[in-house]
Amino acid sequence: EAVEHELFSIELDSIAVKGKKDAVRIFTVLGNNDWVFHNTSWYFNQQQHDKFLIFYRKQQWTTAERFANDLKREWPEMADYYNIMLSRIEEYKKNSPGDDWDGVYRATTK
């Protein structure tokens, strides 16, 4: 519990690795209290990121793309992540995960 107050993180994804049924939620650490103090835009970016994940998991691809592209510009440290997610969105637009998709990325390779 002490870590929660010293480090700030965001959820990146929910992934099921090849051969596994259950998903694991993946997070990244953004920084500590000092980092937050010097990065005043982190809270806004975190809120926008949370909205991105909601639209992504609801298959609202156009809106998710808009959020990802905006966040890439506003949060350059996270640009590689958003590029990966934008690639996934493009793939999902071509091959829908289906109406019953639970928002979990299912890896096809190890």
Q: What kind of feature is each model-predicted range?
A:
Residues 67:
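Extended, hydrophobic beta-loop-alpha segments that form or line the acyl/peptidyl-thioester binding
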